[in-house]
């Protein structure tokens, strides 16, 4: 049997692939909210879907339920600048994430929070965390 003859679960069940992608985004950031640093329980669309935002790695960030709910359908950077917990280093991390530079985003998050934990496997460029 050749590798081309194999059938993978991801090919048969798109929901499984989507679930794996969501988990990888949380894992990539150490399961912390990109906005406030609290544990992330959800995925937030930086550019909301209601405004044409897509479910891509570059547009989806890990967020706690509080930040995700408060942001609602606003543009993330505009909303974030008005928050009491605003940190310019996190704002730069969000911008780097949007531009697809996940490595820089993680470095900026580490700078913003020295206790930020990241898997050594996540020091790569993030290309393995792309939505299909």
Regions found by a protein language model. Name each.
Residues 58-59, 69-132:
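A detector for short metal-coordination/catalytic motifs
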Residues 1-31, 88, 95-108:
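Short, charged surface segments at domain edges that flank catalytic/cofactor-binding sites
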Residues 23-28, 32-38, 120-122:
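Short, contiguous, helix-prone interaction/anchoring segments in small proteins
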């Amino acid at each position: 049997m050749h590798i081309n003859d194999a059938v993978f679960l991801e090919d048969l069940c798109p929901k499984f692939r989507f679930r794996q992608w969501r988990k990888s985004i949380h894992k990539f950031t150490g399961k912390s909210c990109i906005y406030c640093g609290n544990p992330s329980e959800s995925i937030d669309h930086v550019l909301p879907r209601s405004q044409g935002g897509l479910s891509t790695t570059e547009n989806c960030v890990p967020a706690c339920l509080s930040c995700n709910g408060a942001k609602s359908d606003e543009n993330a950077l505009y909303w974030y600048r008005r928050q009491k917990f605003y940190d310019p280093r996190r704002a730069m991390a969000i911008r780097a994430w949007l531009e697809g530079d996940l490595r820089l985003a993680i470095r900026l998050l580490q700078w913003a929070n020295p206790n930020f934990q990241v898997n050594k496997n996540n020091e790569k460029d993030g290309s393995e965390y792309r939505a299909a």
